[in-house]
Amino acid sequence: MDADKIVFKVNNQVVSLKPEIIVDQYEYKYPAIKDLKKPCITLGKAPDLNKAYKSVLSGMNAAKLDPDDVCSYLAAAMQFFEGTCPEDWTSYGILIARKGDRITPNPLVEIKRTDVEGNWALTGGMELTRDPTVSEHASLVGLLLSLYRLSKISGQNTGNYKTNIADRIEQIFETAPFVKIVEHHTLMTTHKMCANWSTIPNFRFLAGTYDMFFSRIEHLYSAIRVGTVVTAYEDCSGLVSFTGFIKQINLTAREAILYFFHKNFEEEIRRMFEPGQETAVPHSYFIHFRSLGLSGKSPYSSNAVGHVFNLIHFVGCYMGQVRSLNATVIAACAPHEMSVLGGYLGEEFFGKGTFERRFFRDEKELQEYEAAELTKSDVALADDGTVNSDDEDYFSGETRSPEAVYTRIMMNGGRLKRSHIRRYVSVSSNHQARPNSFAEFLNKTYSNDS
């Protein structure tokens, strides 16, 4: 008997078959490098840098950039950015550089070259006859890499947000040590012609390489990071949110997770803390794993750990944090239940609201204030109607312990208290809610209950 088969009847005929499903080609992929090989891309033949500069600049002025030529130029231009490595630099067992070595972005990765010549057209006319200076090369590299940042800005940002960022970036790359090489608004005009460049693997790879280099190596032209900084922890919003959350509540990751009272957290916590990843290693390839092509589907994104993401931002909303109110709810990950847990944790860790006395004349005054607040909360618990007098002993100890918080939720039937709902409504109703945001969810869900 085949253990994989099932037997059943169709029109009195016995059928035996093995149920098979489509193999998921998009499984989460962890970024750890196990073969000691650096991240790698293949580009066309290395160009003459002066010719390439003139071609790419003329393409920028005409808003007609060839992505292959741009990538080939960016890889070749790495030679202009040499700095000293401050410490031995290793990641996933790969030695990138030794302390004191003079390095460019090149040793971080492997760039293979073919014999295929680039296009190197002069679409915008031939304006520059002399050879460009290093600062002109640096300015062009900075402007090109900024196209990555601009293409990552989502359509949710309203008004002139993107134009304002493009203008500020242009100002950076026309101020010393850089030099003005394009007219005002050229960057935004060019971006419109290549708005999806963040999806081009080689361009994304080079943006991540430059960012990894400038985040570690002090350099005259470090401001180039203004265009590449979005490659750091890209598609890691779940893990980044969790990290920010534990810093806020001043607990270790282990202590914080004890408050995650929901069965759907189990898979996500396991996913987020898979062993063998360099999540806590500074300047690791992990930080830029998405742009360097080490993972096709991030296990650390908001969608990959949606329950954790929802909970953290509901707690953030309870605190009135704009970032949380603006974040997008992961609708498939129990937002109602997460909002309940978020209300209780928000109250436990952040008090009844934003306004509290935080500063005192001396230690004695601080202790007196804390003692008075403790008495107040004991009275509130006794009068709440949700706590029986039998439970007073239970609450007189560590009221913030996971056991105490869990018991409180259970005693309220897994529902929010009126005070929680009032808090949620007050923070969300004063906020201009974006579509599908946490603010909109709280407004729609709780505004009638307050």
Swiss-Prot record:
A cellular component annotation (GO) from this entry: host cell cytoplasm
Disulfide bond residue pairs: none
Keyword RNA-binding carried by entry: yes
InterPro entries xrefs: Rhabdo_ncapsid, Rhabdovirus_ncapsid_C, Rhabdovirus_ncapsid_N, Rhabdovirus_nucleoprotein-like
Residues bearing the modification Phosphoserine: S389
Keywords: Capsid protein, Helical capsid protein, Host cytoplasm, Phosphoprotein, Ribonucleoprotein, RNA-binding, Superantigen, Viral nucleoprotein, Virion
Source organism superkingdom: Viruses
Keyword Phosphoprotein (UniProt): yes
Additional comment: Displays a superantigen activity in human and mouse, activating mostly V-beta-8 subtypes of T-cell receptor.
Protein role: Encapsidates the genome in a ratio of one protein N per nine ribonucleotides, protecting it from nucleases. If expressed without protein P it binds non-specifically RNA and therefore can bind it's own mRNA. Interaction with protein P abolishes any non-specific RNA binding, and prevents phosphorylation. The soluble N-P complex encapsidates specifically the genomic RNA, with protein N protecting the genome like a pearl necklace. The encapsidated genomic RNA is termed the nucleocapsid (NC) and serves as template for viral transcription and replication.
Complex and partners: Homomultimerizes to form the nucleocapsid. Binds to viral genomic RNA. In nucleocapsid, binds protein P and thereby positions the polymerase on the template. Protein P acts as a chaperone on free protein N to prevent it from aggregation before encapsidating genomic RNA.
UniProt family annotation: Belongs to the lyssavirus nucleocapsid protein family.
Protein name as catalogued: Nucleoprotein
Recorded name of the encoding gene: N
